[in-house]
Amino acid sequence: MVFQNYALYPHLTVEKNIRFPLENLKGAARLSKEEMKKRVMEAARMVQIEELMDRRPGELSGGQQQRVAIARALVKMPRVLLLDEPLSNLDARLRLKTREEIRRIQRATRITTVFVTHDQEEAMSISDQIAVMKEGVLQQTGRPQEVYDDPANLFTARFLGTPPINLFRGSIRNGALFIGTEAVLPAAGLSDQPVLAGIRPEGFLLHEQGPLSCGLENVEIMGRDISIVCSHPDCQTSPLRAIVSSESLSQLPSGTVRFALKPEKVLLFHPETEQRLRPRKEARNEQ
């Protein structure tokens, strides 16, 4: 297990910190000094800290300390490795680099690894399978992209995604999704009812005749994409953000901007239970 604060022994060298778990093995698991040295060097090579073996934790950077903690966990050759928010003490640039390192180590060792984090970007980028929890209750499991595209409830939809999902008060009427007075998408297979409509930032398309009209507040240039910051009276998240290609910048009007929506990026939820609303199968097949 690797803790958030690494829990290294400050008076021991890196080599002795890594070796410490092996010195406490009992019975048949006990190793000779030669076997311990070999195991320690293998773990150090795995996390690329061979040149730091004679240093003490106080002489190391945060990223180096984190790698020592991982080596100490790996040296026992565990069947399961638990990483409990191991990157939370690192700055943004080092977090990104160390995230890649952890992924490399996991692939090299093929040890089943449980990575605990409150950072959804870390969870999405590092995992093969993701488990979303709320107050100790499992909400959903699956591959990161699957959970992002098809969340089971509003909590999961809000947790995953940067910028976060935009949330609108809406209603289903006569087989269409209404936001305010505008019918923005077909909604066959759902009965007439109030809904919460979640729209991913990448789910907007600039369109002169688009059904969703918003007040333009700001445009943020992001290089390949632009973030359009808008307002809408029925939007419950502030600000409303739409991510579109930078090629669309020349199409932006002033004052009011109109959008068409990508149906696969619009998610409907029950306003009270916040569970996902899905059309009847027979209605989906008819479309």
Describe the residue ranges of each PLM region.
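Short flexible coil/turn linkers enriched for glycine and charged/polar residues
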Residues: 54, 161-166, 191, 222-224
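Residues that scaffold the ATP/ADP-binding catalytic core of kinase and kinase-like folds
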Residues: 97, 150, 158-159, 207, ...
